Amino acid sequence: MDLDLKEGRSRPSLLSSFLTPRAAAASPAILTVLLIPGLVIVAAFFLIPLARVAVEVGNGPEGWGTYLLILTNARYLESLIQTLAMSAGVTMMALVLCAVVGLFLVRNRFAGRSILIGTLTLPLSFPGTVVGFMVIMLAGRQGVIGGLTDAAFGSKLVFAYDIAGLFIGYLYFSIPRVILAVMASAEKLDLQLEEAARSLGASRFRVICDVILPGLMPGLISSGAICFATAMGAFGTAFTLATDIDVLPMVIYTEFTRNANIPVAAALSIVLGLITWACLAAVRSFTGEGKSLPVRGGA
């Protein structure tokens, strides 16, 4: 019998020995082999389609001037501005609501708390079309609000199909993406710092501004970037609700499927991707992600 087994020691597995820093440094070929599946997936489902989309832009009648066309054409430019404004507004509203609610949920224990948290995060499991349908059931022609206003005032209040309905739909599916990050940041806040600030005479407002918000800021920034990027590219909710609103994903869909204007659809897709990528890259740079942090030695 093996000596290691007699002494009650188990040998490290082959995979764990490969994953140690020393093995990785000694065997770069192992890392290369392990990276191949990921590289194949990235190439097949991202790089190759992206290259094809970029080529389609140049194949249009305007050539590479298609990018200039979408920035000067009134319809495309208005759609881009509307999408940016909508995404920014939804992001700001989600951050404000989730900062308040998330901090409250972390610092208070009450009956039904877990149910409330589950309800707030439920939209994560819904596709965009379901979210749009729920907004229609709330504020559509046969919705709850329309029925109540018809009974009370004799006319239906319908706003599911305009900018307000789309805003509510975007906000609904954005809340879970923000509140989870806010709650994670709130759990790490040091209550002793708040007590120290109060003991030094700081008002509640100053404690919030100088202690609580700086502690929540990393979670707010990262979740805000994800919320903005998600809202920029949201299609299902816009497809269900945006009958009179030309947000960028809907314009891309219309140009590609109905007008067969593939070069313009490709150029709009590239612009949309660059905007969301720039937003996420700026957040990574601002928060310092990826930078090496000094490690303090200890006993």
What would you call each of these model-derived segments?
Residues 66, 89-120, 133, 137, ...:
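Transmembrane-helix boundary motif in ABC transporter permease subunits
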Residues 2, 39-78, 242-243, 290, ...:
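Short membrane-interfacial helix/loop motifs at transmembrane-helix boundaries
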Residues 35-41, 118, 122, 126, ...:
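Transmembrane alpha-helices
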Residues 1-36, 64, 108-113, 282-299:
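Transmembrane alpha-helical segments of polytopic membrane transport and secretion proteins
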Residues 17-30, 67-76, 238-284, 289:
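Interhelical loop and adjacent transmembrane-helix boundary motif
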Residues 45-53, 178, 219-254:
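Non-cytoplasmic
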Residues 18-24, 64-65, 132-171, 205, ...:
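Membrane-interfacial helix termini and adjacent extracytoplasmic/periplasmic loops
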Residues 32-33, 45-49, 183-198, 210-211, ...:
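C-terminal transmembrane helix and the adjacent membrane-cytosol boundary/short C-terminal tail
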